[in-house]
Amino acid sequence: MTAGSAPPVDYTSLKKNFQPFLSRRVENRSLKSFWDASDISDDVIELAGGMPNERFFPIESMDLKISKVPFNDNPKWHNSFTTAHLDLGSPSELPIARSFQYAETKGLPPLLHFVKDFVSRINRPAFSDETESNWDVILSGGSNDSMFKVFETICDESTTVMIEEFTFTPAMSNVEATGAKVIPIKMNLTFDRESQGIDVEYLTQLLDNWSTGPYKDLNKPRVLYTIATGQNPTGMSVPQWKREKIYQLAQRHDFLIVEDDPYGYLYFPSYNPQEPLENPYHSSDLTTERYLNDFLMKSFLTLDTDARVIRLETFSKIFAPGLRLSFIVANKFLLQKILDLADITTRAPSGTSQAIVYSTIKAMAESNLSSSLSMKEAMFEGWIRWIMQIASKYNHRKNLTLKALYETESYQAGQFTVMEPSAGMFIIIKINWGNFDRPDDLPQQMDILDKFLLKNGVKVVLGYKMAVCPNYSKQNSDFLRLTIAYARDDDQLIEASKRIGSGIKEFFDNYKS
């Protein structure tokens, strides 16, 4: 596929353009089906499918008590609940008799339709035709399952994959399991929101001069994997102008972009040191429309005129990780190949999880349903409002943690710098060596620092452990990653921040270069 070609709006052109990206294993995947999936009339007795009758299920009904507000143990939120009831016959579109049964590999239609509408409203692919028939979504069993299926479909021993130099390392493990080679892409580690994230100049030079560069013995990259918003571990986001440049590079050098976005809805307005606990999410002026248009970073899908972006989303961060429920967005051709893999491996994700998520979203809609909104619109609006409340809580936790870190003696002595995050769950703290030379044995010194932190009663992640190539990132890996997600309450986050400051101070009090 070449830059400037007409957008591929039909399956035939998608197949022509993206067949070369497929793993050699893809051609051997086919489900050897022995059943006839055609519809039968109601008067036919079904003896073909190996499905237990729903009366064999030990659960006949479930009642869900659904929070309207996260952390609603506050007395003022005493009545902030709604409910959902599920039984063998209801809700009519997704009763237990259906959701607990074997189901379509791509996902149960009610939730699948909601998810596609959700993506279309927020990040509609630029290559989409009017009927949205050339792209689709499939549900999957959590982010790692999505990654596994994507990389198994587009990677093999001949593939080179680019990944941000610090990343969620299981993604790298998934790539390497296919035999593909991983190379690190330099990042700008800064709290400047207009320059942070992938170093576009470095990426341009690397690709434009591939034949003479450091990886000239490898095949030219066919894939970029990126956590572009609220990046793990850095909490940084690739600004819009960089996204446009990266997409142009993808066109020029013909590679796919796998955009992993578990944190994208957890946007953080900039920290205000004059009003450290200021939270724009509490503003009465913040509508769902403004949140979507002014707060959220737009997906690479919205730039994707060529259909070369595969987007991964999950319910783990905005609902619950134990559901193991995620979804993949891509052009119809690539998505069918991913679905072919699911057909012979995991099959459908948990129907119980799908039923719980769908019923919860529907209940949120019903509790706020008005005559001006259809159920479809109310479900979208209700779910976005829930996400905004989650984002608001995370933003408060971010502000509280930053304030507590800035008040520590260690920070005020210049022993560390806080890289304020722009989205997500993570904050990184860069260690400042001050009058000391940066140690040659950096990983060992970071391990020693970790022991001082544990001695003070706090556990974090060491930056070098999340490096794609520790040697390549040696000069940038002297940071700590802390998460603001799991702490019980404000007091625990404040205490953890104090302990971090104390641990870093003790480390430097005992440090010998």
Swiss-Prot record:
Purpose: General aromatic amino acid transaminase involved in several otherwise unrelated metabolic pathways. Mainly involved in tryptophan degradation. Active with phenylalanine, tyrosine and tryptophan as amino donors and with phenylpyruvate, hydroxyphenylpyruvate and pyruvate as amino acceptors. Does not accept glutamate or 2-oxoglutarate as substrates. Also active with methionine, leucine, glutamine and kynurenine.
Protein name as catalogued: Aromatic amino acid aminotransferase 2
Additional facts recorded: Present with 7700 molecules/cell in log phase SD medium.
Signal peptide: none
Residues annotated with N6-(pyridoxal phosphate)lysine modification: K317
Subcellular location: Cytoplasm
GO CC terms, sorted: cytoplasm; nucleus
GO molecular function: 2-aminoadipate transaminase activity; aromatic-amino-acid transaminase activity; kynurenine-oxoglutarate transaminase activity; pyridoxal phosphate binding
InterPro entries documented for this protein: Aminotransferase_I/II_large, Class-I_PLP-dep_aminotransf, PyrdxlP-dep_Trfase, PyrdxlP-dep_Trfase_major
Enzyme Commission designation: 2.6.1.57, 2.6.1.7
Pathway: Amino-acid biosynthesis; L-methionine biosynthesis via salvage pathway; L-methionine from S-methyl-5-thio-alpha-D-ribose 1-phosphate: step 6/6; Amino-acid degradation; L-kynurenine degradation; kynurenate from L-kynurenine: step 1/2
Organism of derivation: Saccharomyces cerevisiae (strain ATCC 204508 / S288c)
Location of Phosphoserine modifications: S90, S92
